[in-house]
UniProtKB/Swiss-Prot annotation:
Known catalytic reactions: 3-hydroxypropanoate + NADP(+) = 3-oxopropanoate + NADPH + H(+)
Co-factor requirement: FMN
Protein name: Probable malonic semialdehyde reductase RutE
Annotated InterPro entries: Nitroreductase (IPR029479), Nitroreductase-like (IPR000415), Nitroreductase_HadB/RutE (IPR050461), RutE-like (IPR023936)
GO biological process, one term: uracil catabolic process
Molecular function per GO: 3-hydroxypropionate dehydrogenase (NADP+) activity
Functional note: May reduce toxic product malonic semialdehyde to 3-hydroxypropionic acid, which is excreted.
Native species: Enterobacter sp. (strain 638)
Length: 196
């Protein structure tokens, strides 16, 4: 049985963590990005399918390439963030299943059903995006996930000629708490959950 994490760790990961809109002028190293991935990759996915593919946009040239796809409300904070992660999903993720899930012929589950493959890739890449957020928090970084962007423009700019499709964007860095909005409410257990 696993041990519960400390109350301090719970605050870091959940109750005191915030979505950030402003950033300190502190770089995020490539080594730190590797650490983030090396933590998040252990999060579970269906049949270990691991469909997420990530582009860490961290150069001025990369940000300019991303700029046309951003909504007006997300433009300034994304250009200012040290890193923006494009979380994409590989539409042919199943080609890696003989390596990732050697217990059976999982590849055939998806080659025989394109709809199932797409649903699985999209759902599980979204789960992996959440793991990335928690990996960042565990390493002392802050995040700002976003869906306010033009997916087609991102795909054309970054993934033309590949099997990748964008899912969401996550700004990563060291947040400026002076620019954090007031804490918003969450649904109660009674509003969000049922017991059967």
């Amino acid at each position: 049985m696993s041990e519960a994490i400390t109350p301090t760790a719970m605050k870091t990961l959940f109750t005191e963590a915030r979505t950030h809109n402003g950033w300190q002028e502190m770089p995020v190293s490539d080594e730190t990005l590797r650490e983030i991935y090396d933590l998040m990759k252990w999060g579970p996915t269906s049949a270990n399918c691991s469909p997420a593919r990530i582009v860490f946009v961290r150069t001025p040239e990369g940000k300019e390439k991303l700029r046309p796809s951003l909504s007006s409300g997300n433009l300034a904070k994304t250009l200012a963030a040290p890193v923006t992660a494009i979380i994409a999903w590989d539409s042919e993720f199943y080609e890696r299943l003989p390596e990732l899930f050697p217990h059976g012929d999982a590849r055939s589950w998806f080659t025989s059903s394109p709809a199932l493959a797409e649903e699985t890739a999209f759902r599980n890449s979204a789960m992996q995006a959440a793991y990335l957020i928690f990996a960042c928090r565990a390493l002392g970084l802050d995040t700002g996930p976003m869906s306010g962007f033009d997916r087609q423009k991102v795909d054309e700019a970054f993934f033309t000629g590949t099997t990748l499709k964008s899912n969401l964007l996550i700004n990563i860095g060291y947040g400026d708490f002076s620019k954090v909005y007031g804490r918003l409410p969450r649904l109660s257990f009674e509003d969000a959950c049922g017991l059967v």
